């Protein structure tokens, strides 16, 4: 897979690309991440990538010419990180990971000239109902979520148990020591009984989702076991 990221601040991606899972995925060839400096497509003396908005108002707007030119040199679905976009989630990530190439425009200032959005952008995505200084962090979040779903980047079992992957929040995790400052790990996790452990994890996943994100439960078609466990949870949480 190839991910192109168009940005005015390419150095912001140095750490993102050189550490942890993303760095390993790049090293063994699961993904190529191409950081494109939008100013490389600004040909005036000052490399100006933004200008004042027509009609007046605060802030600056990213100019159309550099973005149109930069987009001529990439392919694949074009995503624009924008507060006006659809909220990015795990289901969208599972669809985007099927693409061979993606291009993400990291917006900045008051955003990009609308002609770019109308003529070049396939999808506007937001990572939440809040405002960032620029779209670089959103581009990293979207890229990270997609890359970890690529084959062999991490074990399939690892991401399938993540929050949201199966429509539920993740269950609690514990590691050694089994007791610390009189705080004990749940006995079932030490039992070696994998059937009971799996059921405990499902129940705690349901519990967290029920208590913290109840709408996910309401939109889910529950299995017979999930219904049974949820009934138990409701009685326990009264």
UniProtKB/Swiss-Prot annotation:
E.C. number(s) listed in UniProt: 2.1.1.228
Cellular compartments annotated: Cytoplasm
GO CC terms of this entry: cytosol
Catalytic activity, reaction form: guanosine(37) in tRNA + S-adenosyl-L-methionine = N(1)-methylguanosine(37) in tRNA + S-adenosyl-L-homocysteine + H(+)
S-adenosyl-L-methionine as UniProt keyword: yes
Residues in coiled coil: none
Presence of keyword tRNA processing: yes
The protein's role, per its UniProt record: Specifically methylates guanosine-37 in various tRNAs.
NCBIfam families given in the database record: PRK00026.1, trmD
Assembly description: Homodimer.
HAMAP family recorded: TrmD (MF_00605)
The protein's name: tRNA (guanine-N(1)-)-methyltransferase
UniProt organism field: Fusobacterium nucleatum subsp. nucleatum (strain ATCC 25586 / DSM 15643 / BCRC 10681 / CIP 101130 / JCM 8532 / KCTC 2640 / LMG 13131 / VPI 4355)
